[in-house]
Curated annotation (Swiss-Prot):
Residues 585-599, 608-652, 751-771 have a biased composition (Basic and acidic residues). This is Inversin-A. SUPFAM superfamilies: Ankyrin repeat (SSF48403). GO terms for biological process: Wnt signaling pathway. Residues 684-701, 727-745, 870-893 have a biased composition (Polar residues). Its main location: cytoplasm. It comes from Xenopus laevis (African clawed frog). The gene is invs-a. CDD domains: IQCD (cd23767). Residues 702-712 have a biased composition (Low complexity).
Length: 1007
């Protein structure tokens, strides 16, 4: 047989005939088309099912006779037997069972025909199905694990329960909620449910069934109390094994549920059957009294308080039943408790310091607040947050409670732990009317908390326009900043409240106020971070700037100010430099004048010394002349003239080699007289012995002058009676002429001496005239020599002073005695260098002005030795004299020019040349400007005085050095700015994401 067509319409003729009972039409349709006998509609139902639903027994019999499938399921999995059991049609049910219908067939929810047969009062269907049901299928469970016995208890079918129990149904099978049939029977509100409970308990009156707990920990007694079925409660508590105070998963007993639901008789019944002296508390520490007070059940509260074991104990939060009643507005319970206990602690605090008045104010229970104020409650009691009842009422916006509290003496100027006033909490809640009430009670609209936030900022954070308008109408300042520099406009832009932004700008809020954090954000920056396009557009139209734009403007102004500062600083530095130069110039001039005065004193001392020496020399010459006259008498006139010339020659050598003079004792006396003159003039430099030593050094270190004074007055002629006597101990390297006299008798010698004495007296006047002209030439020579020394001393003075300073700097940490000794040595060194320099100049003058001597190798050698000695090399010793170094050269030639002419030419050559510069350098002297143009100082000019460098050259060097340092500083500053900007950009980028996500996920972050 082919399967019937699927998806037929409900209005198919065969199905219509089956439901209406038109058997004739049904048979015709079956005869014409046999496949329509099991045709399904959209619900999957066949004509047989429709005949069962329509209670058409004849049609059902005809369909079954023509071969209709009795166990064909519909879309829900149910067969015709399910429909017959559901409707309670006993006749059709019997017909189907006779045609071998399956009574154990389950639909999609695992429901069998046995489950469905318990829905009706008639037990015939159940009995018929149980007759055809196999023994193990009586307790078949549906998807909720419920058996037919569960269904019978739920529908309160005591006869069905007895029938199922008789057929062996198990009363202890739990369903998906852990409930057994006794739970469903006890939880029924019908008073006749006690009969069903009795039927179940008669089947198995065990203690385990009485105290069976479902998956929520509830026993049948919990469910009976919860439904308020007093008969079932009395029945259950009548059994000895029943636990009157079992705990559920919330640690609540049946008494808790009775008090919570206000079942006073059941509560009284449970208290009577409870043998425990203590009333247990639940998981929150609440007793049945708490729940009775919360539910405003004064009778239950009265019953509970009348029991000896019930007391008003605090829960885990420290709240009593009285606080619970005040918080819920249970005025009758509050009055009842105050009536039953006149000494009740109305100001008792909970764990957080809150009182019953706090609880009533928070929930806005105006009647309860008035009752509490009438019973000696403290109106300004504070909790741990320093909140009074007024704070709670302002936060929730209960105007009547606020007015009642203020009339009851509540203070409006108190602040909490965070420095917030009641106006802050009213603004955070957006309660404009409450703000108006508080302002009318003289509260400050610009009050700031400990973070610097005002009520206006709190209202702007939530975007409460009405509250903001009330505050600003009462002269609240919109430009007040908190500790982070944020204003109300910052908060409105951050949360994107366009109306709040418009209102703030309308009340003259500054749009470019920067915060005090590192980012220095403006309100526009917050709008940009939040991506609020409308707020951004409106802010830009009203002149708002971002921090980047403000920094650009500030940078341009800072640069202008910095440029002006640089100009002023450069001018000040130039001015300081010029003033310093002027001070240096004046100091140099003062030092120069001091040096000139010192040189003048030395020249005067030198002239006095020369006069004393000339006086001694004249006395010696007179004695020597007598001896020469005697020698002429002995050896002849020519020998006498030669001795005269030798005497004149030796007279000149007395200034060069004082150790070989015969009158050294007279020189010591002369030195003492010179020292006395210096002491009177105040320029004593050293002892008389040191003067003699210095003069000897000058004589030894002037080879040119020695060579001139040693030149033979006879030219190249040498007398025959002369011989060479080389004495290595003497400084003079010229060969000494000595004669070999013949021995005569003493009488002849005495007579001749007497004659010579007479002749000497006659010649004295002639010799004085000749000596006068010689002294005139000597005095002019000494004046030229003094001028040369002064010129050389002025050049070397700067170098000597520089060396003195360097010596003193290197010895700052030495002892006091070492400093004195070092300064004395430096003074002697300076005096020696000056005298040495003047001697060296005189030697070079002789070399320059004598053409023959310049060509002589010995002169060149002496000049080189002198330069090497000046430049720091080892000086020439007596064994290394210039003459010995040049022994292979020709003999010295006499000078062709006079001494006066030589000194004049030398003074012109050495006007601007230091004493240690050689002949070649003296011809083309170096100048400081030439050195500066070359770009570096020569080693010979490193110790030159700063005064010799022109002012323009010094300023040029200073400017170059300053420009180099400024360029380095600008590069370093630019690198630092770039690094700092990059770090700031990275920090900003990461903080923006964090802040934005934090503010979006936590809208109350500000509070």
């Amino acid at each position: 047989m082919s399967s019937p067509p699927q998806g037929s319409s409900l209005a198919s003729p065969v199905q219509a005939a089956a439901v209406t009972g038109d058997k004739t039409t049904l048979l015709k349709l079956i005869a014409s088309s046999p496949e329509v006998i099991d045709q399904e509609d959209q619900l999957g139902r066949t004509p047989l099912m429709y005949s069962v639903l329509g209670d058409r027994r004849s049609c059902a019999e005809a369909l079954l006779k023509h071969g209709a499938q009795v166990n064909h399921p519909d879309r829900s999995g149910r067969t015709a037997l399910h429909l017959a059991a559901q409707t309670g049609n006993h006749r059709l049910l019997k017909l189907l069972l006779s045609r071998k219908a399956d009574c154990t067939h389950r639909d999609l929810r695992d429901i069998t025909a046995v489950h469905l047969s318990t829905r009706h009062q008639d037990t015939r269907c159940l009995a018929l199905i149980l007759k055809y049901t196999p023994p193990g299928q009586v307790d078949a469970q549906d998807q909720r694990k419920q058996t037919a016995l569960h269904w019978s208890a739920y529908y309160n079918r005591p006869r069905h329960v007895r029938l199922l129990v008789r057929h062996g149904s198990n009363i202890g099978i739990p369903d998906t909620e852990g409930k057994i049939p006794l739970h469903w029977a006890a939880g029924h509100k019908d008073p006749e449910a006690a009969l069903t409970v009795r039927c179940l308990l008669e089947a198995a009156p065990t203690e385990s069934l009485l105290n069976w707990q479902d998956y929520e920990g509830r026993t049948p007694l919990h469910l009976a109390v919860g439904d308020g079925n007093q008969e079932v409660v009395r029945l259950l508590t009548s059994y000895r094994g029943c636990n009157v105070a079992p705990y559920d998963n919330l640690f609540r007993t049946p008494l808790h549920w009775a008090a919570l639901l206000g079942y006073t008789p059941i509560a009284h019944l449970l208290l009577e059957t409870n043998n425990s002296p203590n009333i247990p508390s639940d998981s929150q520490g609440a007793t049945p009294l708490h729940y009775a007070a919360q539910g405003n059940c004064p009778d239950t509260v009265r019953v509970l308080l009348s029991h000896i074991s019930v007391r008003d104990e605090a829960d885990l939060e420290g709240r009593t039943a009285f606080m619970w009643a005040a918080g819920k507005g249970s005025d009758e319970v509050v009055r009842t408790m105050l009536e039953l206990d006149p000494e009740l602690e109305v100001n008792r605090t909970d764990k957080y310091g809150g009182t019953a008045l706090h609880a009533a104010s928070l929930s806005g229970q105006i009647t309860t607040v008035r009752i509490l104020l009438e019973n000696r409650v403290q109106v300004d009691a504070v909790d741990v947050m320093k909140h009074t009842a007024l704070f709670r009422a302002c936060e929730m916006g209960h105007r009547e409670v606020i007015s009642t509290l203020i009339k009851g003496g509540a203070k409006v100027h108190l602040v909490d732990k965070d420095g917030r006033s009641p106006l802050h909490w009213a603004a955070l809640g957006g309660n404009a009317n409450v703000c108006q009430i508080l302002i009318e009670n003289n509260i400050n609209p610009d009050a700031q908390d400990y973070e610097g936030r005002t009520p206006l900022q709190c209202a702007a954070y939530g975007g409460y326009i009405g509250c903001m308008e009330v505050l600003m109408e009462n002269k609240a300042d919109p430009n007040i900043q908190d500790k982070n520099g944020r204003t109300a406009l910052h908060w409105s832009c951050n949360n994107g409240y366009l109306d709040a932004v418009k209102l703030l700008l309308g009340y003259s809020a500054f749009p470019n106020q920067m915060e005090n954090t590192e980012e220095r954000y403006t309100p526009l920056d917050y709008a940009l971070l939040g991506g609020h396009q409308e707020v951004i557009q409106f802010m830009l139209e009203h002149g708002a700037l971002s921090i980047a734009a403000i920094q650009d403007i500030a940078a341009s102004k800072i640069q202008a100010v910095y440029k002006g500062h640089k100009v002023r600083r450069a001018f000040q530095e130039r001015k300081n430099l010029l003033m310093k130069h002027e001070q240096l110039r004046k100091g140099a001039a003062a030092k120069k004048r001091e040096g000139e005065n010192r040189q003048k004193g030395k020249v005067g001392q030198t002239e006095g010394k020369q006069k004393d020496e000339n006086h001694v020399m004249r006395q010696d010459k007179s004695n020597e002349h007598i001896q020469n006259e005697v020698m002429r008498e002995w050896y002849g006139e020519e020998t006498g003239r030669a001795e005269d010339r030798k005497e004149e020659h030796q007279e000149e050598n007395q200034n060069i080699e004082p150790k070989q003079l015969k009158h050294s004792k007279h020189m010591e006396q002369n030195s003492k007289s010179i020292a006395k003159n210096q002491k009177r003039a105040g320029h004593i430099q050293s002892s008389p012995i040191e003067h003699v030593h210095t003069n000897s050094i000058q004589t030894r270190m002037s080879p040119s002058r020695t060579s001139i004074s040693h030149s033979s007055p006879l030219g190249n002629e040498t007398p025959k009676n002369m011989y060479w006597d080389d004495n290595p101990t003497q400084n003079n390297t010229q060969p000494r002429r000595t004669s070999r006299p013949q021995i005569e008798s003493p009488n002849i010698i005495v007579h001749r001496i007497e004659d010579l004495v007479q002749k000497e007296s006659r010649r004295k006047s002639h010799r004085e005239e000749r000596k006068g002209s010689h002294r005139q030439r000597a005095s002019s020579h000494h004046r030229l020599q003094a001028s040369e020394r002064e010129t050389a001393g002025s050049v070397i003075h700067g170098e000597v002073e520089f060396k003195k300073k360097e010596t003193k700097k290197g010895r700052r940490t030495a002892a006091g005695t070492s400093k004195i000794r070092a300064s004395g040595e430096a003074g002697r060194l300076s005096q020696s260098e000056k005298e040495f320099s003047s001697t060296g100049i005189q030697g070079r003058v002789d070399c320059i002005t004598s053409p023959e001597s310049c060509e002589t190798p010995s002169r060149v050698c002496r000049e080189r030795k002198m330069i090497s000695a000046k430049s720091g090399q080892r000086p020439l010793t007596e064994t290394q004299s210039p003459e010995k170094a040049c022994q292979g050269s020709s003999a010295l030639k006499p000078s062709l020019t006079s001494h006066t002419k030589q000194t004049a030419i030398a003074s012109k050559c050495l006007d601007s040349t230091p004493s240690y510069i050689g002949f070649g350098e003296a011809i083309k002297p170096l100048t400081p400007m030439g050195i500066l143009r070359e770009g570096s100082f020569s080693s010979k000019w490193q110790n030159i005085d700063i005064e010799l460098i022109p002012l323009e050259a010094r300023l040029q060097l200073v400017e170059k050095e300053k420009a180099r340092k400024q360029l380095f500083q600008r590069k370093k500053h630019a690198a630092t700015v770039i690094q700092k900007a990059w770090r700031t950009y990275c920090i900003r980028k990461s903080s923006r994401k964090t802040r934005h996500s934090h503010l979006r996920n936590n809208p109350r972050a500000m509070v």
